[in-house]
Amino acid sequence: MDIRKEYLEFFRSKGHEVISSMPLVPDDPTLMFTNAGMVQFKDIFTGAVPTPKNKRATSCQLCVRAGGKHNDLENVGYTARHHTLFEMLGNFSFGDYFKEDAIAYAWEFVTVNLALPIDKLWVTVHNNDDEAFDIWSKYINPSRIMRFGDKDNFWSMGDTGACGPCSEIFYDQGEENFNGEEDYMGGDGDRFLEIWNLVFMQYERTADGKLNPLPKPSIDTGMGLERVIAIKEGVFNNFDSSNFKPIIKKIEEISSKNATSENIGSYRVIADHLRACSFMLSQGILFGNEGRPYVLRRILRRAVRHGYLIGFRKPFMAKLLDTLIEIMGGHYTELVENKNFIEEQLTLEEDRFFKTIDLGMSLFNEELEKTKDIFSGVTAFKLYDTYGFPLDLTEDMLRDRGLKVDLAKFDELMNNQKAMAKAAWKGSGDTSNEGDFKQLLEKFGSNEFVGYNNTTYKSKIIALLDEHFKEVKILEKDSTGWVMLDKTPFYATSGGQNGDIGALEDNKHIAIVEETTKFHGLNLSKVKVVNSSLKQGESVDAIVVNRNEVAKHHSATHLLQSALKIVLGDTVSQAGSLNDASRLRFDFTYPKAMTKEQIDEVEDLVNSMIARGISGNVEELPIEQAKKKGAIAMFGEKYGDVVRVVSFEDVSVEFCGGTHVRNTADIGSFYIVKESGVSAGVRRIEAVCGTAAIKYTKDIISKMNEIQAEVKNSDVILGIKKLKEQIKDLKKEIETSQSKTSSPIEETIINDTKVIVSVVENGDLKKIVDDTKNANEKVAIFLLQAKDDKVLIVAGSKNTNIKAGDWIKNIAPIVGGGGGGRPDFAQAGGKDTSKIQEAKTKALDYAKENL
């Protein structure tokens, strides 16, 4: 049985509209990831957006709980049902049906469609929810209905807002299978497994804690697909179901090791984390050092560490992707469409971690031998900072041994170094003004953007806000604040395009528009009042400046993406962008630096597209029709049922809400200024076009003229080559001079080994040591030099019993220093030049004792 399909079709038959899973990156600044089915309907439940015509919806939502408030990462592999990524089935009513129908639908699906035995089912309701109790009593013996308090059976979005009692359906997995102390209804054991939660949103909680009945109660339900599949297949652990078992078998195959009771946890971790990493990558989340990218990195590295435990020493995750696609690719086509990209990114990140994991594990095991109760916070930090071990990975390794990290010391080091993981999520968002924006939205509604065809517009000021987003009636001269126009020509920052700037004018006053941003559906422009004042209710001329230049760069970005796909291949995808009047920046997925030839080819391709004078076309299409047309969507972006599509004939077709030129010829010319790396697997191109390109070429010509004058040669390249030759010759002279020391290097023979211990006044110590080792088959050399009130020490050893690193460690403290290195080469520094001769003597004594 395809339970996912069965569920969606069941609720479709009950008048529900089937809604696709929303992106894992939610359009909600308070959430790290989409973590429940109701997230995409939150604005409907709160009244922030109008209720749709069809007040019934159903979905199968991909969810991630591995960061922020909801984090199951540390439990994965140790329990039967925790996952970093899971699917949540849900049905929703927006002021339509309520408890009677919600319970009836749930009971029908569970007992008829799933055919679960009634004598295995239990139900919970809130202590005070007699209505739900009475309804359930029609379907199940009241002795199987349990009442619980707020902790278990009351749900709310937050301290205020929509909330209500909930009712949960449990499945009894059998006393014969689970008979521990916690295996009772309401206990923490695994015998009674919650499979479905029905939330009855019937109240609004106010700031004083009062519960006011909602005029139109709603329904929000959630059922974990993985749990239901396990129940239907008669297994007691989600990882033993058909959702995971094929992946675990594939791990056994490629590792040539069968899972055992001792190591099965590692196989389960890898299977789970493969799913999370693959879906996150497919939706444009890339590996990085902060925010969501860092969570992705933590998940992947945890999987690699468990792979290491079962014998993997090189990248292996990509080899599992085909198996995952066989299981989930039929419903989630993004896995198939982005298969090559996912494999590429997994392999790159795994390879990076495998290069340091041996060293990190050695350090970990070394510290572990010294640990009794608390693992060193200093070592945990070094594992993180030097070897790329996330803290929770170290904690995970200690968990099996019953040990903990000295978190106080770890945090102290992190704070001192301002480590990037200290505040892992930059996008946490400031929600302190959310109530103010909601009030504005309720008061005025969303204001209309009219700027696609207008750069000037007669608008009315419907709201003014001060710098802290508090509503005011007037903004005085020289003050800064925010303006909400009834109809605005100013484009708000989104989709990689910077918000418009410009001015608000009339006969009396002028305000400079410094930026335009969207807050909770409101287009607001930040203004600086430079003359007179701005008052609510007044009409002004809204004037956009530099729009044409911004449009040129945005359209050029679309052409650039097409050119990159032609030159580098279709696996290239957008990872971010920025467009303003002076430049464009385009981030894209590619595993290595572009060659000069590739950069030139891309630049030439874009300029040829510009020269063709291709007409632009903008249309709004149903999303499925747009996809069939080949429109490229930005990974991670949230789209509605109808999307805006910008196309330049067959050259470029993209989902886009930004502003563009009418014809590619309007762009003028295009120059790539820089190609660089952003992170592993992500490259960045910076480019200019239009007026900015003219300025760029003028600057280049000006600099060339300056260089020409400096090198005193009409052929600049030839002049630079001559200068480089002169510099090379001068460097040789300096090196020769430095290698000639003012004091002779002292040599001696100890047990057939040449030993050099000397104080050198001038010269490059490292070069002298290297040259000496190259010139001798068997030699030990120890050089000291006083320079700028400091002591430099360099030691080398070739085919002798002396280890240079140990030699340095023993002598450097004499001059107040420290250092170390390899057995064949080491160096150190010291502060006390007065002890240099003593150090020399001790160094020679050390050689005599060890040879």
Curated annotation (Swiss-Prot):
What does the record list as coiled-coil region(s)? Answer: none
Q: Which GO terms describe its cellular component?
A: cytosol
Q: Gene3D superfamilies attached here?
A: 2.40.30.130, 3.10.310.40, 3.30.54.20, Bira Bifunctional Protein, Domain 2 (3.30.930.10), Threonyl-trna Synthetase, Chain A, domain 2 (3.30.980.10)
Q: How is the cofactor bound?
A: Binds 1 zinc ion per subunit.
Q: Which Gene Ontology molecular-function terms are recorded?
A: alanine-tRNA ligase activity; aminoacyl-tRNA deacylase activity; ATP binding; tRNA binding; zinc ion binding
**Chief subcellular location:** cytoplasm
Pfam hit, one: tRNA_SAD
The EC number(s) given in the record are: 6.1.1.7
UniProt: Zn(2+) binding residues = 554, 558, 656, 660
Q: Which SUPFAM superfamilies match?
A: Class II aaRS and biotin synthetases, Putative anticodon-binding domain of alanyl-tRNA synthetase (AlaRS), ThrRS/AlaRS common domain, Translation proteins
What is the protein's known function? Catalyzes the attachment of alanine to tRNA(Ala) in a two-step reaction: alanine is first activated by ATP to form Ala-AMP and then transferred to the acceptor end of tRNA(Ala). Also edits incorrectly charged Ser-tRNA(Ala) and Gly-tRNA(Ala) via its editing domain.
User: Under which name does UniProt file this protein?
Assistant: Alanine--tRNA ligase
